[in-house]
Amino acid sequence: MSDVVDRGGAWAVVGAGPHGLSALKNLLELGLDADGFERDTDLGGNWNFHAENSRVYESTHLISTKPFTQFPDFPMPDAYPDYPSHWQVHRYFRSYAEHFGLFEHLHFNSEVVSVTPAPGERWDVTVLDRSTGETATRQYAGVVIANGHNWWPKIPQYPGQDTFTGEIKHSADYKSAEVVRGKRVLVVGAGNTGCDVAVESAQNAKETYHSTRRGYYYNPKYAFGRPSDQTADLLLALRLPLALRRVMFKSVLRLTVGDFEKFGLRKPDHEFFETHPIVNQQLVYYVGHGDIQPKPDIDRFDGSTV
């Protein structure tokens, strides 16, 4: 390792996903020098489909619309649809970096392996060049950590799981419908990814079952002819009491989607706004057509059965 290089008043930004890019851009706008470090060969973080630990799959689209996703000082192109694909989102981030001159401050294939305090309220940042295997340490006035949270997949454990004769895959390893094509599939979990995978499985697998521990509010992407987050924004602008807002949102959901229990889905055991929103236009549709069969939480595994 070489001697420590003092970068004076410069800041280091760890990660070149959306938060890392915006942090780098704002530091530069404040007149500060800054270096951005990204372990992959391109920016975008989770939205870079080809990145080593990207969790997006071929069919991934935003669950929020352009006005609620784009940077306020750099709108998404007018030609983009309401819910852009991950390819479009990644192109947007590259355009953002080009527009604000960020590429000259970004270091790719550069993995930050340690950040340690240094005398004088400074920070030593050690970076591994993944192309050469060499490390170098630079000292900064400050560090912004923007390396994301979708890194290590967690698979729950159930009794008898080690006896299961089928495949067990985490959604982190799901990239396309080829994973489920022609198979009997059980999708576990009703987060946005779980719902997306269940829908793709319904379209491509032999049979699809969907196991959830609880009921959820499955919000449509469109309500009353417009994107649902824009409809929701109109209701939120009324600044009504929380209890009344919950009544209104559940009423809108019942009018636009229906009674979940009549579809065989479990009744939510929590109130609106108490969990991360599930936005999926198609899950209830495929449940209603019998292509997705709702199931409760897993109790145990037994050989080839669950």
Regions found by a protein language model. Give the residues of each.
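Catalytic lobes of large eukaryotic enzymes
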Residues: 60-70
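Flavin (primarily FAD) cofactor-binding/catalytic cores of flavoenzymes
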Residues: 2-62, 75, 81-222, 226, ...
